[in-house]
Amino acid sequence: MESIGIVAPQTMHFAEPLRLQSGSVIGNYQLVVETYGELNAARSNAVLVCHALNASHHVAGVYADDPRSTGWWDNMVGPGKPLDTNRFFVIGVNNLGSCFGSTGPMSADPSTGKPYGASFPVVTVEDWVHAQARVADAFGIERFAAVMGGSLGGMQALAWSLMYPERVAHCIDIASTPKLSAQNIAFNEVARSAILSDPDFHGGDYYAHGVKPKRGLRVARMIGHITYLSDDDMAEKFGRALRRADGALDAYNFSFDVEFEVESYLRYQGDKFADYFDANTYLLITRALDYFDPAKAFDGNLTAALAHTQAKYLIASFSTDWRFAPARSREIVKALLDNKRTVSYAEIDAPHGHDAFLLDDARYHNLIRAYYERIANEVGA
């Protein structure tokens, strides 16, 4: 299947202030957006793809000045791909608080002319959805054919179906959860603590010091990567292999330098992440993850929380995902069925853990392709 090819982002400016769930107000903000495919005359073939923690608006294609800049879900979105851009108009939005061009901690605070830094207000999944709704309004899209996402993106898709039930025909929620477990909140807290305790953090105002809390970001990313992979996948990829060709005991360095392949992998991922991601953004997004809990306002009753939804749903999970285990997806399915909603559920047998939602797995992609075929028939795409 061909790639969507060269793409370019666009920046959308919004003058109307956005009141956040915290009570803070963001005024005169911008969101970076990419679109793929063509919006039909009826504006009925639009699909919103919501991104996860470290991703962005750049869902598919490449940038002209960097042929290596492949979109984070390029295997899913494009001509002839499961989400076929020959049939659908796909929108990717970089969320508020991110570090890829939308208004966030790195942006200039109009009141000071300096980066917001630690003063940027805490944002939630619900805040992102309200901001995304303004993007839809700007395109003249009254109703999405589908809102889709994996992991944190799946939480946004679910929130869309709750907050704007009349604007979502289908909700595709992959490798996600209705709320974080205590264990998941704990992982996020350890990652945040690594950043907050980095001497280069400077209370979140490190921009003025010309430094970046890279040590903390590295550790945060390493923690994340451990949770994204399954034990079996890590065993197959790395096992106990040493970086030295000779795996015998006498090949040990007897030091604390990198010796095992898994150590090398984690440090590589940590270094790469620390080079391109912003620490304040990491704090904001992980806290948004922690706060997401639509059932909280209903005394923990997810069935009651989903009572006013109108969409049809595809919920998908992966057998070896222990970060957001299949049981968490089944909680959503049960609550939807209790409300007599139309819901399809698939638990895909895949060895790759949580990261499976990003990978090119034939059974997974066939599932998504078949579901979008159904949507295409409904909207005449």
From Swiss-Prot:
Keyword flag Transferase: yes
Gene Ontology BP annotations: homoserine metabolic process; methionine biosynthetic process
In which domain of life is the source organism classified?
Bacteria
Q: Which GO terms describe its cellular component?
A: cytoplasm
Q: Which residues form the AB hydrolase-1 domain?
A: 45-360
Sections of the chain in a coiled coil: none
Pfam families documented for this protein: Abhydrolase_1
- Catalytic activity annotated for this protein? L-homoserine + succinyl-CoA = O-succinyl-L-homoserine + CoA
Task: List site positions: Important for acyl-CoA specificity.
Answer: R323
Concerning HAMAP family, the annotation shows: MetX_acyltransf
**Subunit-level organization:** Homodimer.
Q: What is the name of the protein in this document? A: Homoserine O-succinyltransferase
| Designated gene of the protein | metXS
